[in-house]
UniProtKB/Swiss-Prot annotation:
Protein name: ESAT-6-like protein EsxL
Function: Induces apoptosis of host cells. Is immunogenic with highly specific seroreactivity towards TB patients' serum.
Main localization category: secreted
Family under the similarity heading: Belongs to the WXG100 family. ESAT-6 subfamily.
Subcellular location: Secreted
Gene label: esxL
Organism: Mycobacterium tuberculosis (strain ATCC 25618 / H37Rv)
Induction: Differentially expressed under different growth conditions. Highly expressed in sputum bacteria.
Cellular component, GO, one term: plasma membrane
Length: 94
């Protein structure tokens, strides 16, 4: 009996997570544009409150990006490790 694992699917999933992390930058910029459009709420685009909000938003997006990218890397590494182990075990049975 042969068991076929789709390790490429695991790698592709990890790559997708990392790609989605990269797409966060475009979303971040869109939110900043919206914040600047509504900057009167904070007292104007140059106000300390508006700039502080934008800074905090940037920090939050950076943390999310780093975590998503790291998770994608771990998923890809796990898939690669499983594939290597499977290959080693499979060749020892031949």
């Amino acid at each position: 009996m042969t068991i076929n694992y789709q390790f490429g699917d695991v790698d592709a999933h990890g790559a997708m997570i990392r790609a989605q992390a990269g797409l966060l930058e475009a979303e971040h910029q869109a939110i900043i544009r919206d914040v600047l459009t509504a900057s009167d709420f904070w007292g104007g685009a140059g106000s300390a409150a508006c700039q502080g909000f934008i800074t905090q938003l940037g920090r939050n997006f950076q943390v999310i990006y780093e975590q998503a990218n790291a998770h994608g890397q771990k998923v890809q590494a796990a898939g690669n490790n499983m594939a290597q182990t499977d290959s080693a075990v499979g060749s020892s049975w031949a």
